[in-house]
Amino acid sequence: MEQNEREKKGAGAPNSAKAIVEALLFAAGDEGLSLSQIAAVLEVSELEAKAVIEELQQDCRREERGIQLVELGGVFLLATKKEHAPYLKKLVEAPGASPLSQAALETLAIIAYRQPITRAEIEEIRGVKSDKPLQTLMARALIKEVGRAEGTGRPILYGTTPEFLDYFGLKTLEELPPLPEWADDGESEREADLFFEKLAENLSDGQPEYGKLKKNG
């Protein structure tokens, strides 16, 4: 009886379970979900949850699917396929594409200069949540997951992509303009704001025409 009830709620209906897992992973975004989290939501064993995940992975491998289900450091998440990168690049560089917001520029600048870096570290520097800017930058293929940090939860590490270099007319990261000195002994809120303004200015200089960033000095 208990087994029947569990099947009604979870993996007893494979198609429904796959759809639920896909929805969960979409909602989780770039943080993804662990096997235990997925199993808990489906109210099934981890073995049953893994079977559903594997079926969904197989579905995503079909040519007509634009996303893939990947496992990174024990966490499952949805990601675009590498073969679609040229089209994502076109989206970024399209004349009608909306410019990056100030929040996205700040986040991108921090990643560019501090990579590899976690979301928590980005938010510590910015002082605000950075989920939406990260999602925007991931969607535009300007940043990517480059690994997992050590420690509790093994958070995702972010880094820039080749598309980032193309977007700002750079050949390598070494061509990034030098930053103003950043003191570690604490600064006023105004000085922190100026720091971010400088970062955004450095990056946005190349934004309209995707030209080379200006170097200081």
Curated annotation (Swiss-Prot):
UniProt subcellular location: Cytoplasm
Keywords: Cell cycle, Cell division, Chromosome partition, Cytoplasm
Superkingdom per UniProt: Bacteria
Pfam families in alphabetical order: SMC_ScpB
GO terms for biological process, alphabetical: cell division; chromosome separation; DNA replication
One Gene Ontology CC term in the entry: cytoplasm
NCBIfam families in the record: SMC-Scp complex subunit ScpB
UniProt protein name: Segregation and condensation protein B
Organism: Geobacillus kaustophilus (strain HTA426)
Lineage: Bacteria, Bacillati, Bacillota, Bacilli, Bacillales
Designated gene of the protein: scpB
